[in-house]
Amino acid sequence: MIHEKSKLLKNLETAESLKLSPLPYHTSRLLELSDVSIAYGSRAVCSNISFTIEQGDRIALQGKNGSGKSSILKLICGENIPYQGILRKSERLKISYVPQSTAGLNGFLSEYIERNLLDESLFKAILRKFDFPREQFEKRLDEFSEGQKKKVLLAKSLCEQAHLYIWDEPLNYIDVLSRMQIENLLLEYKPTILFVEHDSAFCENIATKTVEL
């Protein structure tokens, strides 16, 4: 066990560190939810949720399965989620979103890059830092493992300059070394981020604030 940990730390030392370019915003408050409730038909998902996001916050959104965590993230990102209450978003707020599901990934990586207007060199460089073999770039996305698909979504977000990063279970299917790279990245660049993650150690290390649903 000690040998494995020592090997992992050595690998982390040799692994290239990830980079991020969070954008500053001209006011400290980016977003506010006041008494927000979400229901799908007669099924209530969450009720009377209130919190604010200030610049520099790293907020862990926590709650049981089915408590509305993903719905809150999607609502903030502008998806058509039925809700009551008040959601105030700062004007021209740029958000970078990593969804929980990888289901939408299809076609070739080159098509994904073009579709999302990504810098190809930067995007592929990030994937290489995530230990992607070069031959993987030529395969279809639906041939990727779940961990590789999640890395594609994370690499896209790391390419994007944003005021607010919203990540839904970013560590799902991710190997231990990449988890450590992601943790180091967030502690170094300190982006404003709202995230859902079941890894309690990650939440404890990263979050400056916790919101319970």
Give residue ranges: language-model regions.
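Coupling and communication elements adjacent to P-loop NTPase active sites across diverse families
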Residues: M1-A44, E54
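Conserved hydrophobic segment flanking the Walker A/P-loop of ABC-type ATPase nucleotide-binding domains
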Residues: F51-E54, L61
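ABC ATPase nucleotide-binding domain signature region
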Residues: R58, K64, S71-F123, E197, ...
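Conserved H-loop
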Residues: P191-V196
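A short, surface-exposed alpha-helical micro-motif characterized by mixed small hydrophobic
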Residues: C203-N205
